[in-house]
Amino acid sequence: MLKTENLSVGYGNYVVVEGINLEINRGEILCIIGPNGAGKSTLLKTIATYLKPKKGVVYLNGKKIHDLKPKDLAKEMAVVLTERVNPGNMTGFDVVAIGRHPYTDLFGRLTERDKKIIIESARAVNAEYLLEKNFFEMSDGERQKIMIARALAQEPKVLILDEPTSFLDAKHKIELTLLLRKLADEKNLAIVVTLHDIELALRIADKMALIKNHKVIAYGYPENVMKREIVNELYDLKNANYSEVIGYFELKNNPIKNKKIFVICGGGTGANVLRYLVKNRYDVVVGHLA
């Protein structure tokens, strides 16, 4: 479906990431993870043809993606970037309608089918109630829903999203993450997304790519990629460790109290007690009775 072959990306004469070999099929989600400045956004913009590759090729259904005409590509791929948009006094309906541009006539007139798809796209992201609302009056979470609805209105087979949860609170982050999984499953979309939240990425990803130091340091199924030593290296962790059990980070314990406390627990029963003791800088040992 979508494939990169020995791809190198960057700006001007500067190569940000090189030797990228990724592949994603319809119905799958590929999450790209990495520290700030690693080149995640540059990679997505190259895949979306906003930037030309420094080397290598991006294929879409076996065709070189940078050779496709913009209108033809817009019918196959939709993109939602991080940058905030300012469409003035446009309503949610007007913004979603932009997604029909590849299909409208010279004057941009909407057919009844176009209008039906606009409503269905908003409904797919639980945003039908926002169609008559002015975009500037919407919350960040509502705006993101409308932007994804606009992308869906293009009737794409591939959806590219750059850090879609950046401006969202915890509730809307979870809702959006679950929405992406739903779209991949129900609409059979191939989704490529960059995320900062590893915990959420693990919940939805079929494949993960970790980027650091100008290259992809790990790529594959999450359970094979998200190993403690790999994630610790990815973020140069000194005062924390990535836990494969909980799928997130645990702060290292630097005890300052002389008492050593032995905690008998198992099966996650001691988690709250252990966190309390570590937070209060006790020297903690864990085990079970023989």
UniProtKB/Swiss-Prot annotation:
**Any one GO cellular component localisation term in the record:** ATP-binding cassette (ABC) transporter complex
Residues annotated to bind ATP: 34-41
Q: Which residues form a coiled coil?
A: none
Instruction: Name one matching Pfam family.
Output: ABC_tran
Could you list this entry's UniProt keywords, alphabetically sorted.
Answer: ATP-binding, Nucleotide-binding, Transport
GO molecular function: any one? ATPase-coupled transmembrane transporter activity
Q: Where is the ABC transporter domain?
A: 2-238
Q: Which PANTHER family match?
A: IRON ABC TRANSPORTER, ATP-BINDING PROTEIN, METAL TRANSPORT SYSTEM ATP-BINDING PROTEIN TM_0124-RELATED
Family, according to the entry, reads as follows:
Belongs to the ABC transporter superfamily.
Q: How is this protein named in the record?
A: Uncharacterized ABC transporter ATP-binding protein MJ0873
